[in-house]
Amino acid sequence: RLAPNGVRVTLLEPRQSPGAGVAYSTAEPTHRINVPAARMQLAGDEEGAFDHWYRHQPAFTVDVQALRPDGSVYPQRGQFGRYVAQRFADAAASSGGRLRHLRDRALAFHQGTVTTDGGLQLKADLLVLAISHPPPSLPAQAEAWRHHPALIANPWQPGALDAIAPHARVAVMGTGLTMADTVATLDRLGHRGSIVAFSRHGLLSRGNLSGAGATWPGDYQQGSLR
């Protein structure tokens, strides 16, 4: 949008859809954005652009849980990934070939040349690192458990939680939004065993009062190991 004529931009992204990253690539229906859609848009978009786009998608019609009593919408998180991919496709289509997406991974940059995992050598005057968050990985202290059959290092991996027995006891390292994703997915899968989430600070993500959901029927307790 702001680049002068003659500038060519090549995006190296191994995923099929650019712009979704780890968080917005999820296809899990219980994973939702944690702010109203009206507060999410790309730089340069009009305020509420994503909200307007989503309300005109078939997904909005079939997802009855997206619309809250106050009129705001909280789409499944993958919908924002689709929105970003659509905006990228629109920009690429109108760029006259100046913007392209290569499904490849950059390995090195040396003397103005990017080397990719697929063996390409790309000349570049400028290199922009926009790598976002990497997938979850084990902390160094847990490296000895890497191959333990009960350990799930990346709960966002498709199907990662499917093999957990309905009444198995589950421990989650961390009490942030990834923990919330994990609990929501387990609930959808019918898990009814105990879940213990622990972290150094023990704080939960802030709740949202715009919904009219029923009171959680489970036994929730907060404690400390100190």
Region locations from a protein language model:
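Core beta-strand elements of the Rossmann-like FAD/NAD(P) dinucleotide-binding domain
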Residues: 117-126, 165-166
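Helical element adjacent to the flavin cofactor pocket in flavoenzyme catalytic cores
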Residues: 81-100
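Conserved beta-strand-loop-beta-strand element in the redox core of flavoprotein oxidoreductases
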Residues: 108-121, 149
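A conserved short coil-to-beta-strand element within the FAD-binding core of flavoproteins
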Residues: 97-113
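Glycine-rich active-site loop/strand segments that organize a redox cofactor
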Residues: 12-82, 198-226
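A structural signal for well-ordered alpha-helical segments within the folded catalytic domains
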Residues: 78, 82-86, 177-180
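Rossmann-like dinucleotide-binding core of oxidoreductases
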Residues: 1-3, 7-18, 128-226
